[in-house]
Every structure is written in C-alpha cells, then in structure tokens.
C-alpha cells in the first residue's frame, strides 16, 4: 500500500492556512490520506500533514469520510479534551474544544452536525470524540495545531486578586450552581465554571 510521509512539527506547512481546492483533486488526496491514516493508526489526517497545501481532511471515528474546504459555522458547549497528533508524536495536550459543532464543506450538500445526540445508537463519548477530531483536522487546515488550542488554567484565575482564598463565591455551569470557598472553587473554574459576579 502506497502511503505518504507524515510532516512533523515544527514545519511551516503545518502553521500556514491551506488553499481551497476542487473535488477531483480532493478525492485523490483523500485516498492518500486514508491509506496513510490506516498505516499510522490515527483517527484523522489533513492534507498539509502529508505535505499537500490543500484544504482537505479525513476522519475515521464512527465511519470514514473526507471534508473539502470545510468550515465550522456553529459551536456549542465548551469542554476540555486531551489530544495527541500524528505530526506531534509522543505528546498529549489538554485542549479547549466544543462538544458539538456544525460544519459546512464543499463536498456535502447539507450542514453536518458532530457531537452527542438524544436517542442516538452510538455512544455519546464516541460522538464527542468525533466532534473533537473534526475540530482538530479543520484547525490543521487553518494552520493551527493542538498547541494553539492548549488549555491554560491560568486564564481562569484572573479573578484571584478580587477574591481571598477563603472568601465565599458562587459559581455556575449550565443550570448547576455552587457556593464554596474560592480556594476550592479554582478546580471548578478550570473546568469551565464561571463566577457569578
């Protein structure tokens, strides 16, 4: 089986947005991507990861598919995820992602929705994984890596000067609300909870 070499970070092609392309070119690149993905054992791969400056990526979580010139048009529910990347071997990064996304691509007629669904036969954890994988690959096509999405707990501690460690705060996430000491609330803030001002 003819496969391509994976481009390893750092490399300019991984940090530069890819160019739009046509369906015929995309289909040829997708074949190479799927072959390479099968050999490397990943869940997704983008064209620039095999040296092609084209906006094409493949994903194989619940089923194999490719996306041509994709863009995310809507996102829902922020989450922190743990990701690896074939172009950044032996490295796992906690990333800021979304649990559910809506995507448009030139090779599909309708908007594609990735993420958990009610009454779905597929495990919701798998559907979230697929949504994260699609975000990961579209990031590649936009010249971004997992380092650009790295979750930084410090950004949730900006209020530290306003609150003493033992001061009581009220935090919320969705419909859940908690009241506790600030020092105990930090771990919740790192998971996306917000202080009720």
Feature roles, as predicted:
Residues 1-179, 183-197:
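Positively charged
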């Amino acid at each position: 089986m003819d496969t391509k070499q994976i481009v390893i970070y750092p490399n300019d092609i991984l940090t530069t947005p890819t160019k739009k392309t046509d369906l015929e070119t995309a289909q040829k690149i997708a074949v190479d991507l799927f072959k390479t993905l099968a050999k490397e054992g990943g869940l997704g791969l983008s064209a620039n990861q095999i040296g092609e400056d084209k906006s094409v990526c493949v994903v194989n979580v619940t089923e194999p598919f490719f996306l041509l010139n994709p863009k995310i048009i809507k996102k829902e529910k922020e989450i922190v995820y743990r990701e690896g990347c074939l172009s950044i071997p032996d490295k796992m990064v906690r990333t800021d992602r979304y649990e559910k996304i809506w995507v448009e691509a030139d090779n599909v007629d309708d908007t594609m929705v990735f993420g958990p669904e009610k009454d779905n036969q597929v495990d919701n954890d798998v559907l979230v994984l697929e949504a994260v994988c699609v975000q990961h690959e579209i990031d590649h096509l936009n010249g971004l890596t997992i380092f650009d999405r790295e979750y930084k707990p410090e950004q949730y501690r900006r209020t530290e000067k306003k609150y003493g460690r033992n001061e009581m705060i009220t935090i919320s996430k969705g419909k859940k609300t908690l009241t506790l000491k600030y020092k105990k609330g930090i771990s919740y803030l790192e998971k996306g909870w917000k202080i009720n001002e």
